[in-house]
């Protein structure tokens, strides 16, 4: 009888393959009326019959077939069935009850698919009845174990192999895992350097399994120019600027090359150059080299160099160790008064750091989430000018801690809040610092409403809150407020700063246009709109 049942099903499906796709009309036999009533329609006969059996119609039979009309006798709907225990379940009893066989079958199929058996099949074998309840046995045929034998790139064939292995976590020879492969698209979307033309596909051959990826290299280089208007310490009108250049994935190694130049209203100049290579020799080890130069007018010049080796935990985060070399030279040797505040020194140190970043799908947004934590141990050798003797050599130990984090929250469609916290501290036993080793904050990138790098401190903290109304992906207007505290042991200053302002950002053919207006105050001063700062710039992608 069962053999005849499958013959009928096969015959019906064969007819459908050569004809126009039609819907089957299923009629159910009613024991009370002794007649058939129309039950439902479906285009796939076999899947319909399988579904009915899975939900509990285990005695289902086909009474007759007339064209597209299928006359069924569903039989009894078994709410509870007893499944025979075997190596698949490993329970204590010979049989165990269930009222959701479909979920069991789905779970078994999913587990095997993610363990290298994508073609695993489960056979339901009836084992009779007990107390009017169905007893069955599930027999699992796993098939052959599948492993990833190769990755084929279609489109961007020079995609870095280290990124494939450690960024996308695809390793040749690993066991096939469908759940893991389904996350590849979301992983690709976490970088700005590539896009996905279509979803990954898997080619199953008799003796091999090949994964096909469809990446596309995108333009990800940036030029960002910001021009600021304000006044210097004498109240005179001054221009200041900030130029950023970012070259990304130029050599197809997912590398980042950045240059940042800042010129302030007080004739200070800083240059920051960095090179980041995330997958050295196709490994999960990366390198980040940083060179910084700061010159305060003609008074002194600082040079900082650091080399950071990091381990890529995943696409979003890494942990690293750094080597640090710093030096500073006082340029006005004939100025004895200034020489007491500025020391020649050299520093060497090591540090630990952790970095986490998740991009936001909107191009206007800096990112969705960011966290950077660092701890450095530094040994400083300095040459101090003394009124009693010309040079006084001194060696001290210092510790540096830093934190910067932000998070973008979507309060409601089109309404976003960005919260930012930044902290940095340079610590030493005697709290004795040189003027030329202090942090310099202020301006568009830190606390808005003040001149670029016009505030010095050995410890500071900044908390910012931005509200943004984003009607579409290409435009937003916002309000912001910044609060900061500074501690300057050198000048014996401990105070707080406050600023607020508004800004606008939108996409143009040239790039992203930014315009902001901010005004700030200290504990000793009030808001003076004559001292307000205006910044505008264009972030161009090429």
Give the residues covered by each predicted segment.
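Bacterial Sec-dependent N-terminal signal peptides
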Residues: 1-23, 542
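Transmembrane beta-barrel domains of outer membrane proteins
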Residues: 141, 214-216, 246-248, 276-278, ...
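Predominantly transmembrane beta-strands of Gram-negative outer membrane beta-barrel pores used
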Residues: 224-265, 270-294, 306-308, 503
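C-terminal transmembrane beta-barrel domains of outer membrane proteins
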Residues: 240-244, 258-263, 272-274, 369-542
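Transmembrane beta-strand segments of outer-membrane beta-barrel domains in Gram-negative
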Residues: 286-428
